[in-house]
Amino acid sequence: MIDTVTDLSRLRGIVADWRRQGLRVALVPTMGNLHAGHFSLVMLARHYADRVVSSVFVNPTQFGPHEDFQRYPRTPEADMRGLEHVGCDVLWLPSVETMYPLGTERTVRLFIPCVSDVLEGTFRPGHFEGVCTVVARLFNQVLPDVAVFGKKDYQQLVVIRQMVVDLAFPIEILGGCIVRESDGLAMSSRNQYLSMQQRPQAAEIHRTLIAMRDAVMSGGVHADVEAEAVRRLEAAGFQVDYAVIRLPDLCEPIDGIVISQGIALVAARLGNTRLIDNLEF
């Protein structure tokens, strides 16, 4: 049975006991409202560790002033049942006071330069600062051997890997594959904001990503591929923040040079719902 923990001292005691037994510990951080994508991360963690801690914390410092912190869906009972079903050992439920004992205004903040400034960083200033701040605290609380993050938030994964290297966290970072609906839409907690009319439209993002990948692999000019992706998404009713081709480290590829590995990334709004997705190749 899953152990739900709200006290940091108790959490540390549990993890310390696992350590004394020589067990390997994994952390799966989440903001709750869990779906099959999240549960796949827990199952991946179980392959790399003997015990799994999953945290649920809706982090106020990674939401912008006009974003959806207050209305972000919270489903604690369903989250607990789902985590127990996939073999999570501990559900860590810290309070805002536990995460930010000096308050969010006075807290020490972490900023990862360069990779935090582009794409999502341009459209959500301060977002990755909040992400890194809370993830570093979770690392210090749980002291995991391995931590698992979803590849749907690909830029977040790159940012966290850079933070782990730079701050010498002795933690292996794993990226879990995107889990999709039958029509290709990436599973997301924000999909439930979509209306019945918008839901079929949303799958156009994945189809556009496939077209971007195919065009690049056929020798298409990156700028032309990106422009066509924007046109296609706008024709489907989206307001596009970006539709880009990048190298795996998120650097821009040089036109005219064939890239052996890359990633197509899209962020776009359908009505009031902002969706992100990507496709590696």
From Swiss-Prot:
Residues the entry annotates as binding (R)-pantoate: 62, 156
Binding site for ATP: 31-38, 150-153, 179, 187-190
Primary localisation category: cytoplasm
UniProt keyword annotation of Nucleotide-binding present: yes
Annotated residues for binding of beta-alanine: 62
Transmembrane segments: none
Name of the molecule in the record: Pantothenate synthetase
Source organism per UniProt: Xylella fastidiosa (strain Temecula1 / ATCC 700964)
